[in-house]
């Protein structure tokens, strides 16, 4: 027979051996300047909101999350049949990142060509900036999800 106490474990989704993380500004290979600042700010905001980790300076941090924006791209999904004006576009951001324990040198998480994208509608007065900002926010949430402990 199953014992009730042998079922689920109630514990945090995040590593319990980490309390602090440094998040330097992501570097970029993209010509879309400024996205690295938006992304870094969004990651810091999401770490503080979603996880038990505190973002601190590198000299006080248990871990460091570093990354590089590899590409920022816009794809047109649909155009107006008569004018060829884009009606629906996708803004995508591709990053490489590594989360490392500064105390041991151990890599806690590493991802290459990690991408998040968001649809936006220029014909509804949504600009490329709107698409980029939405992609940045989605990407920040996804990166913080990757900082959860392995099951």
Locate predicted features.
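A structural "domain/chain start" motif
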Residues: 1-60, 70, 74, 103, ...
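Surface-exposed short loop/turn segments
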Residues: 9, 49-54, 59-108, 117-132, ...
């Amino acid at each position: 027979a199953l014992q009730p106490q042998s079922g689920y474990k109630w514990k945090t989704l995040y590593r319990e051996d980490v309390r602090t993380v440094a998040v330097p500004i992501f570097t970029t290979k993209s010509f879309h300047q400024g996205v690295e600042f938006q992304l870094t700010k969004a990651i810091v905001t999401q770490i503080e909101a979603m996880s038990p980790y505190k973002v601190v300076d590198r000299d006080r941090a248990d871990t460091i999350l570093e990354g590089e924006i590899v590409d920022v791209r816009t794809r047109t999904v649909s155009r107006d049949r008569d004018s060829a004006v884009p009606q629906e576009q996708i803004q995508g951001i591709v990053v490489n990142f590594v989360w490392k324990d500064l105390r041991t040198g151990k890599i806690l998480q590493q991802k290459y060509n990690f991408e998040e994208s968001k649809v936006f509608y220029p014909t509804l007065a949504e600009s490329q900036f709107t698409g980029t900002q939405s992609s940045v926010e989605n990407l920040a949430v996804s990166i913080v999800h990757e900082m959860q402990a392995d099951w």
